[in-house]
Amino acid sequence: MLDILLTNIGQLLTMDQEDGVLRQEAMKTLPVIESGAVGIKDGVIMFVGTAEEAKGLQAREIIDCEGKVVSPGLVDPHTHLVFGGSRENEIALKLQGVPYLEILEQGGGILSTVNATKKASKEELVKKANFHLDRMLSFGVTTVEAKSGYGLDDETEWKQLEVVAQLQKEHPIDLVSTFLGAHAVPKEYKGKSKEFLQWMLDLLPAIKEKELAEFVDIFCETGVFSVEESKEFLLEAKELGFDVKIHADEIDPLGGAEAAAEIGAASADHLVGASDKGIEMLANSNTVATLLPGTTFYLNKESFARGRKMIDEGVAVALATDFNPGSCPTENIQLVMSIAMLKLKMTPEEVWNAVTVNSAYAINRGDVAGKIRVGRKADLVLWDAHHYAYVPYHYGVSHVNTVWKNGNLAYTRGDKAWSKATI
């Protein structure tokens, strides 16, 4: 006896093809069962097939999906979830053409968020991040990577990681924690980046002991941390047992993509300025390219990451929101899917694979998230759409009808009681 049987599914997107990251033709392929059904028991998927094949199955609850699309829960592999305050006051300055460095000198930019995060209590940060997670869930996301990075000191970075750990216990969404202490160089360490990185490295053994982070990340960019500094820092983190990621080539082609491939990073993120050589090296590596077109869009930049070229050359591409208060204040991964289709020239099939299978592998969750397969946990989304391409095509709104997390009802459109969180 099943707990739940979803039937009369118009298109069941299983995403279940080869194991491992998807590249080239595999990214263009979307496994779809027309007129499908999914059976769930004890939070686990027990049946995947056609509605006709499911006719003999017994279930405590049978849900008629009315010919709509069902997919795996989406995976957002790059967010800056935990932070204090907001920065809407900077919009007018940006529109007036005030340079970012001048905004920084006025106490704005990342320094504003760092100060607000330092001042906020752990309880305040939990409440705020919970609000944002609820929104992510409403957009169909069931697994999220969450970074620290708005402390730039030991106490606040630790506080952010503890917030993620608490939310992992309390919120339906699965969280994957990343230590991004090397997000920027604080004023007091100006010209002394190596000393600052050593301070951050000194925190890692305790973070590892308390299991507060699975990944270590660094911002490799002009004026922040060099390629050599980034490689050395991440290799030392790997020696301590962490997997690593890198904010790479967001603005300039510094060689961050090449560095990620060389050191075996789980992902290289941003990559707007990635060189041809960097793309080639990523294609010949196991590193996932996590592209963040929502950030480029919000910053009103003309040049987007070369997603089309990356896919054609064999890079495993994932998509993420880069949710953060400065350069991409949105939890809407569906909007990111639309931007990727229009600006990165990705097909609807590639976009879907990039927010499920490949995004799961970008955070070492490829064996548990991003696919609908017998034996896996039942993270499922019912969409108010009768064709999968409709979701990125009709942009700017949420098409989610219902979300199940581990087989439990986690969100239903129109249920005003589903979220008690406030910002």
Swiss-Prot record:
Positions bound to Zn(2+): 78, 80, 247, 322
Family of this protein: Belongs to the metallo-dependent hydrolases superfamily. HutI family.
Keyword Iron belongs to the record: yes
Top-level taxonomy: Bacteria, Bacillati, Bacillota, Bacilli, Bacillales
UniProt: N-formimidoyl-L-glutamate binding residues: 150, 324, 326
Listed name of the protein: Imidazolonepropionase
Cofactor(s) needed: Zn(2+); Fe(3+)
Primary gene name: hutI
Organism expressing this protein natively: Bacillus cytotoxicus (strain DSM 22905 / CIP 110041 / 391-98 / NVH 391-98)
InterPro entries: Amidohydro-rel, HutI, Metal-dep_hydrolase_composite, Metal_Hydrolase
One GO term of the biological process aspect: L-histidine catabolic process to glutamate and formate
EC code: 3.5.2.7
